[in-house]
């Protein structure tokens, strides 16, 4: 770390140095530390570049390398490095599908996957951690055996969701599933919930803390 700090002091302004230091602080990936040390001059050159200043100065998670000149593969190693380097997800997806609960998302995803040959993972089947979701999508998007893909977003209570959203292409096409409120209530009332895993007790009495149910029903930030 002392070697990195010495180089940063020589090559970057305090504000630019904080970009890399923040990324190092937020990571527990030893491979990322080693990568940053081995490529510190390339990272500094990019942070000093005109392209970075014009495009990423105000970005909440600016990339530490030029995302347009990165050679990657579908490995977990590359996916984790890309997350720590704040690299946007590869732009190989056709669109983003936003699906609030109760709008027929499962049926639409089946239509995409089976009828349209567009591979799209159901977000509610993925871990509730944005890094894991990013890595899974990153590996899929770099898999040459999968041609057409889309990304599904359905939940808000995901760890590090803000970073995940910031690493999506802001110019992507978006399909948003909607439904009238009464229709959503009818759907949820008539649905078979027997196969749904719930994170709260299904038996309670007057001493039970009702806030557990309210917190489950409400979207919340982690």
Language-model segments: which ranges?
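Serine/threonine-rich low-complexity intrinsically disordered regions
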Residues: 1-2, 13, 29, 39, ...
């Amino acid at each position: 770390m002392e070697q990195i700090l010495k180089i940063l002091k020589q090559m970057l302004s305090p504000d630019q140095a904080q970009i890399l230091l923040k990324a190092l602080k937020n990571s527990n990936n030893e491979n990322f530390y080693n990568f940053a040390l081995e490529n510190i001059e390339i990272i500094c050159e990019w942070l000093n570049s005109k392209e970075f200043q014009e495009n990423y100065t105000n970005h909440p998670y600016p990339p530490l390398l030029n995302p347009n000149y990165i050679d990657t593969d579908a490995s977990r190693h590359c996916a984790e490095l890309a997350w720590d380097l704040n690299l946007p997800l590869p732009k190989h997806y056709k669109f983003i599908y936003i699906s609030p609960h109760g709008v027929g998302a499962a049926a639409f995803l089946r239509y995409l996957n089976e009828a349209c040959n567009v591979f799209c993972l159901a977000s509610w089947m993925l871990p509730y951690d944005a890094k894991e979701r990013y890595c899974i999508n990153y590996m899929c998007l770099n898999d040459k055996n999968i041609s057409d893909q889309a990304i599904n977003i359905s939940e808000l209570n995901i760890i590090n969701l803000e970073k995940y959203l910031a690493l999506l292409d802001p110019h992507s096409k978006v399909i948003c599933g909607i439904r009238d409120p009464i229709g959503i209530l009818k759907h949820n009332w008539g649905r078979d919930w027997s196969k749904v895993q719930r994170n709260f007790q299904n038996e309670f009495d007057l001493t039970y803390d009702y806030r557990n149910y309210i917190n489950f029903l409400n979207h919340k930030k982690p």
